[in-house]
C-alpha cells in the first residue's frame, strides 16, 4: 500500500494557503469576522462569540448587554434564522481550542491595525452594512435589499420577512430559472409557430399556384370547347347557306327555262290567232297540243326539307342563347359567393355529455355528463351544440368532416330552437339537417325522412343561402348535390351539430 505523505510540487504552496484560509474561515465569527472569543453554540449548531450573539440579540440602542440581561425568547439564529433560546447557549470548548492553536501560529492580519487577526476567507470579504459595519448576511424581502444581523433586530425590519442571503439568492435563482424555463418554452412555441406558419404559408402559396394553373386550364378548355362548338354551328350554317344558294340557283335556272318556253308558246298562240281562218284552223290543233306540255303547278323556290334544316339551326341558336345566359349567371353566382366562413363551436350551448376539442372544432360524445354551468343557451337533453356565430343574411358555406359510424347529424337551426327538454329533429322545430343512421344517409325531412342515395361520405359542404331561402348539402369529393331544404327564414340561424354515439364524431374542416 502506498503511503500518503505531504504534497509537493508547484501547487503545494497554493493548496496549503487555501487550506489555511479555509481553516481560518471556520474559526471566524460570522458576526464580527474575527477569531472567536468565548465561542458559544446555539441550538441549531451555529457558533458565535458570546458578546457578538448577545449584542445581536439586544435591541439596537439598548447598550451592550450582559449575560445576565433577560432577553425575550425565542430569538432567531443570526445565520440560519432558526429559533434559539438565550438560556440554552453552550460554550464550544473544542472550537475555542482550535482558535487558540491558530493564534499560536501568529498568522499575519488581513490589514494593518486590525487587532492582529489573520486574513479572512473570500466569503467573509463581502460587502458590509454602511450603518453598522457588519457583514451583509441577510436579505429583507419587504425592502428588497441586503441587511446585517444588527439591522435585522432594528425596529425598521423587526416585522419584515428576512432570509439568509444565501437562501434568498437561491430562491431568486430558482424563481429566475423557472421564469427562464417558461420563457424558453414560450420561445420554443413561438419558433414552432413561426416554422408552422412559414410551412403552411408555403403550402398555401403552392396550392394557390396550382389553383391558378387549374383555373387557367379550365377556362382554356372552356374557351376551346366554345370555339369548337361555335365552329361546328357556323359550319352547319355555312353548309345550309350553300345548299340554299345551290337550290336557289337550280330553281332560278329551271324557272328561266320554263319562262322562256312559256313566252315562246304565248307568242306562237298569239301569232296563230292572227292568221286567216283557213290557216288558223290548220295550225290550231298543232298549237293546242303544245299547250298541253305546260306545267300544271308552280315550282317551289325552297324545299320544305331545306326549311326544316334552317328551322332546326334556328332552334339550336335559340337554345344556345338560353344555355349561355344560364351558364353565365350560374358561373358568376358561384364565383361571387361568400368565402367559406370560419366556424368554432360554442361551449355555452353544448350538452354536458358532449366533449369539445381545445380548438372548438371537433365534438364527440363522452361516457358521462360533465359538471357544467346550467347556461340558458345550453341543450340539457338533446346531445347538440351550436356554432358560436349565426347568420341573418347573405350566402355562406362551411365543410364538416364526418365519422364513418352511425350517430351524427348536422345542419342549421333557428336561434329560438328549444334548448331544454327532449325535442324532435325536424324542420317544424327549426332544424334543417342531414344524418347518418342505420348505415344510411338521410335528409331529416317531415313527416318522413328522405333517403339520400349516395356512396360513402367523408366530408360534406353545407351551403346556406338566406337570400333565396335554401340549405343545401354537397359531397365535397365531387361536389355532388345531396339535398336542398327550401326555407322561409324568419330569424337568425346557427350551424348545428349533434353526436349521439360514442363511436363517431363531427369536425369542422379544416
From Swiss-Prot:
Bridged cysteine pairs (disulfide): none
Reaction it catalyzes: S-ubiquitinyl-[E2 ubiquitin-conjugating enzyme]-L-cysteine + [acceptor protein]-L-lysine = [E2 ubiquitin-conjugating enzyme]-L-cysteine + N(6)-ubiquitinyl-[acceptor protein]-L-lysine
Residues of the B30.2/SPRY domain: 323-510
Enzyme Commission numbers on file: 2.3.2.27
Domain of life: Eukaryota
Pfam family, one: PRY
Keywords carried by this UniProt record: Antiviral defense, Coiled coil, Cytoplasm, Golgi apparatus, Metal-binding, Nucleus, Phosphoprotein, Transferase, Ubl conjugation, Ubl conjugation pathway, Zinc, Zinc-finger
Residue stretches in coiled coil: 165-275
GO cellular component annotations of the record: cytoplasm; Golgi apparatus; nucleus
GO BP, sorted A to Z: defense response to virus; protein ubiquitination
Effect of disrupting the coding gene: Deletion mutant protects mice from DNA virus infection.
Pathway(s) per entry: Protein modification; protein ubiquitination
First and last residues of each zinc finger (RING-type): 29-81
Modifications the protein undergoes after translation, according to the UniProt entry: Phosphorylated at Ser-106 by RPS6KA5/MSK1, which stimulates the ubiquitin ligase activity.
InterPro entries: B30.2/SPRY (IPR001870), B30.2/SPRY_sf (IPR043136), Butyrophylin_SPRY (IPR003879), ConA-like_dom_sf (IPR013320), PRY (IPR006574), SPRY_dom (IPR003877), TRIM/RBCC (IPR050143), Znf_B-box (IPR000315)
Binding of Zn(2+), residues: 129, 132, 151, 157
Subcellular location: Nucleus; Cytoplasm; Golgi apparatus
Modified positions (Phosphoserine) in chain numbering: 106
Gene Ontology MF annotations: transferase activity; zinc ion binding
Zinc finger intervals, B box-type: 124-165
Tissue spec. comment: Highly expressed in antigen-presenting cells.
Domain comment in the entry: The B30.2 domain mediates interaction with GYG.
Primary role: E3 ubiquitin-protein ligase that have both tumor-promoting and tumor-suppressing activities and functions in several biological processes including innate immunity, regulation of ferroptosis as well as cell proliferation and migration. Acts as an antiviral effector against multiple viruses by targeting specific viral proteins for ubiquitination and degradation including norovirus NTPase protein. Mechanistically, recognizes the C-terminal glutamine-containing motif generated by viral proteases that process the polyproteins and trigger their ubiquitination and subsequent degradation.
Family, as annotated: Belongs to the TRIM/RBCC family.
Oligomer and partners: Forms homodimers. Interacts with GNIP2. Interacts with GYG1. Interacts with RNF187 (via C-terminus).
Protein name: E3 ubiquitin-protein ligase TRIM7
Name of the coding gene: Trim7
